[in-house]
């Protein structure tokens, strides 16, 4: 599979977490490509069994597509953990490097990397790392806005805003802050 197809699968996967059908416009905006390019790639992905496309409604990932996208997120997350924990990259630097490395990673390399890292459950910013089959645990975290004055909490996940991530300490683990009134 080409890295371009993999990027589309990842984008569809991300957008479909909010709603099942993903429009070509959403993909065009996210990937910064023209609408005709999106249409062409969606047809290729449908032909290969990764998405089901309904005209004027959008694309929906098939089980095969979701599994493949989950593997890509696994590869990406494992590389982020390695780059942050072992090579001391910032979150944004690790993300950028992992974007390239994920496309070059085999299942065997990912398995060995996972073992070397001690089977991490979360990437550096707190998202669960998918299992080898591409499946992923759901998130059950509360947002900071759910807290009441005087509460304290442990931040376990940071939404991928790299300007914010570079401002915060590299490891999200056990970063405990009092509620700010």
Predicted regions and their residues:
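Basic, amphipathic "hinge/linker" alpha-helix immediately C-terminal to the N-terminal HTH DNA-binding motif
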Residues: 57-76
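Key DNA-contact positions within bacterial/archaeal DNA-binding proteins
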Residues: 36
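Single conserved hydrophobic/aromatic residue that forms the stacking wall/gate
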Residues: 174-181
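Short, hydrophobic-biased segments on the C-terminal half of alpha helices
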Residues: 42-43
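A short, conserved structural fragment
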Residues: 48-54
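C-terminal regulatory/oligomerization modules of transcriptional regulators
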Residues: 103-162
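N-terminal helix-turn-helix DNA-binding core of bacterial DNA-binding proteins
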Residues: 2-33
